[in-house]
């Protein structure tokens, strides 16, 4: 039994915001914003990295059903390469908060900095393992991105994206050097950029 965060910590109209996919060499960075409903408890909420895939999938459906409002947003590979990963992540977080159907009175952002928002915000370091709404956001973002990487694995076979989700594993790096980058690889990330530079020389 995986114990979750104390749902009594949920406050009215507070959005939790988190991202997944800053480290991978390919694919989008995906963010989510969630306003939980204090009257509709969700048991077992925790940092998505601490949950099994099956548990994340079950909570994904429950969060979308019970939350007062939620939004999954993203920044594309082209935006990551143009802006850099930090600015692209902030942009995707803005999109998630702006996409909520209910305006939060406060947005709590996982990490140590906040995007520019039209509502008050505060960063919470390791927020996904402390704040239920951020944990819920981490689950929506991770499940959404993982599902997309499985689809991209079908479009670009041979790289093992369904397994490593784009992270720079030995399998991914070997496939990258053997097959070359796809259109969804981040050209601004060193392993991809170095490969492209070498092919030009």
Swiss-Prot record:
SUPFAM superfamilies listed in its UniProt record: Ribonuclease H-like
InterPro entries: RNase_HII, RNase_HII/HIII, RNase_HII/HIII_dom, RNaseH-like_sf, RNaseH_sf
Residue ranges of every copy of the RNase H type-2 domain listed in the record: 12-201
Cofactor note: Manganese or magnesium. Binds 1 divalent metal ion per monomer in the absence of substrate. May bind a second metal ion after substrate binding.
The protein, known as: Ribonuclease HII
Pfam families documented for this protein: RNase_HII
Main location: cytoplasm
Entry keyword DNA damage: no
Family under the similarity heading: Belongs to the RNase HII family.
Co-factor requirement: Mn(2+); Mg(2+)
Coiled coil: none
Species of provenance: Pseudomonas paraeruginosa (strain DSM 24068 / PA7)
HAMAP family registered for this protein in UniProt: RNase_HII_B
Molecular function, one GO term: manganese ion binding
Top EC category: hydrolase
The enzyme's E.C. designation: 3.1.26.4
The protein's role, per its UniProt record: Endonuclease that specifically degrades the RNA of RNA-DNA hybrids.
């Amino acid at each position: 039994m995986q114990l979750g965060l104390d749902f009594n910590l949920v406050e009215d109209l507070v959005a939790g915001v988190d991202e997944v996919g800053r480290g991978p060499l390919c694919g989008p960075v995906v963010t989510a914003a969630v306003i939980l409903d204090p009257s509709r408890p969700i048991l077992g909420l925790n940092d998505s990295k601490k949950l099994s895939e099956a548990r994340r999938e079950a909570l994904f459906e429950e969060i979308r059903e019970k939350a007062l409002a939620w939004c999954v947003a993203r920044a594309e590979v082209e935006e990551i390469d143009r802006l850099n990963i930090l600015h692209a992540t902030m942009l995707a977080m803005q999109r998630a908060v702006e996409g909520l159907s209910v305006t939060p009175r406060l947005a709590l952002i996982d990490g140590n900095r906040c995007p520019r928002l039209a509502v008050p915000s505060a960063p919470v370091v390791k927020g996904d393992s402390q704040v239920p709404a951020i944990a819920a956001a981490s689950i929506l973002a991770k499940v959404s991105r993982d599902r997309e990487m499985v689809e991209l694995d079908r479009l670009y076979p041979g790289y093992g994206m369904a397994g490593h989700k784009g992270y720079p594993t030995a399998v991914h790096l070997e496939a990258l050097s053997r097959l070359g980058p796809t259109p969804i690889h981040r050209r601004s990330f060193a392993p991809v950029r170095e490969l492209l530079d070498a092919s030009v020389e």
